[in-house]
C-alpha cells in the first residue's frame, strides 16, 4: 500500500464492507493463503452477489477495464489486513511485464509468495468460458515471468501461488 493515508482508507472501507460479513472476509483470506480455490470461489461469488451492482462490474466487453479495475481494487482492499505478513504491491514490473497484485512474504520460510492476475471474460479473445479466461491469466503469469521478483527476493518457485481471477459481470471464477 502506497502510504499511510491510503492504507487507512482501505482498512476503513473494508471494515465497512465486512461489518456484517466478517466471516466471508476471513474465509476468503484463509482460502487464499491455503490455496483453496473452491472456498475462494464460493466466498467471492457470495460477496459479489450480495454487495456488487452490475454498474460496478460491467456487462459488456467494451467495459473491459472498468470491471477489471473494480475487482482489482476490491481484492486489494481484502488483502490490506495481510500487510503485517506481506509486502503488498500492485501494477509493478516483474519479468517481462506488469503483474496485477503480488504478495511478497516478509518471512519466506513461513509464508508463500502470491501472484494474482485479473482478466475480464471476452469472447473476442477466443474465450468460451471463464475457465478459458483463468487459463489466459495463468499463462500470462508464466510467459511474462512475473515470479522473478519473488524468486530474486528468496522465495522458492515451489512456494509461489499463482492465481487467475476471471470476471463476467458479477460472476467470478478463480483458478490456480
For each predicted feature, which ranges?
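Extended alpha-helical interface modules used as scaffolds for assembling large macromolecular complexes
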Residues: 1-145, 172-176
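Domain-level recognition of nuclease-like catalytic cores that cleave nucleotide substrates
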Residues: 149-176
Amino acid at each position: 500500500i502506497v502510504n499511510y493515508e491510503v492504507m487507512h482508507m482501505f482498512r476503513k472501507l473494508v471494515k465497512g464492507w465486512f461489518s456484517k460479513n466478517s466471516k466471508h472476509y476471513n474465509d476468503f483470506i484463509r482460502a487464499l493463503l491455503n490455496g483453496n480455490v473452491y472456498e475462494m470461489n464460493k466466498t467471492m461469488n457470495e460477496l459479489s452477489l450480495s454487495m456488487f451492482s452490475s454498474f460496478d462490474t460491467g456487462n459488456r466487453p467494451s467495459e473491459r477495464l472498468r470491471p477489471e479495475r473494480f475487482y482489482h481494487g476490491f481484492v486489494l482492499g481484502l488483502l490490506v489486513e495481510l500487510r503485517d505478513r506481506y509486502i503488498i504491491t500492485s501494477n509493478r514490473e516483474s519479468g517481462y511485464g506488469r503483474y496485477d497484485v503480488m504478495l511478497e512474504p516478509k518471512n519466506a520460510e513461513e509464508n508463500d509468495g502470491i501472484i494474482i492476475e485479473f482478466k475480464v471474460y471476452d469472447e473476442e479473445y477466443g474465450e468460451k468460458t471463464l475457465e478459458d479466461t483463468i487459463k489466459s491469466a495463468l499463462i500470462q503469469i508464466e510467459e511474462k515471468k512475473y515470479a522473478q521478483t519473488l524468486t530474486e527476493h528468496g522465495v522458492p518457485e515451489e512456494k509461489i501461488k499463482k492465481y487467475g481471477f476471471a470476471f463476467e459481470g458479477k460472476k467470478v471464477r478463480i483458478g490456480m
